[in-house]
Amino acid sequence: MKAEEIRGLADDELVARVLELEEERFRLRFRSGTEALEEPLRLRSIRRDIARLKTVQRERQLAARGR
């Protein structure tokens, strides 16, 4: 997911997407402990997508405060 796509999302969509990705990350981490993953790099991309989403959320919080 690119930053431009993320910035186009509404605030509630950002929150929903973060929750969805965190659930997927949890499931993949759990499965990686018990079996080999088909796409081990998916964990990295999910982690980075979560970071991008949270960065945009924080930028919006700071912009709302007037910083």
Curated annotation (Swiss-Prot):
Keywords: Ribonucleoprotein, Ribosomal protein. CDD domains: Ribosomal_L29_HIP. Belongs to the universal ribosomal protein uL29 family. It comes from Gemmatimonas aurantiaca (strain DSM 14586 / JCM 11422 / NBRC 100505 / T-27). Pfam families: Ribosomal_L29. GO terms for molecular function: structural constituent of ribosome. This is Large ribosomal subunit protein uL29. The lineage of its organism: Bacteria, Pseudomonadati, Gemmatimonadota, Gemmatimonadia, Gemmatimonadales. GO terms for cellular component: cytosolic large ribosomal subunit. The keyword NADP does not apply. SUPFAM superfamilies: Ribosomal protein L29 (L29p) (SSF46561).
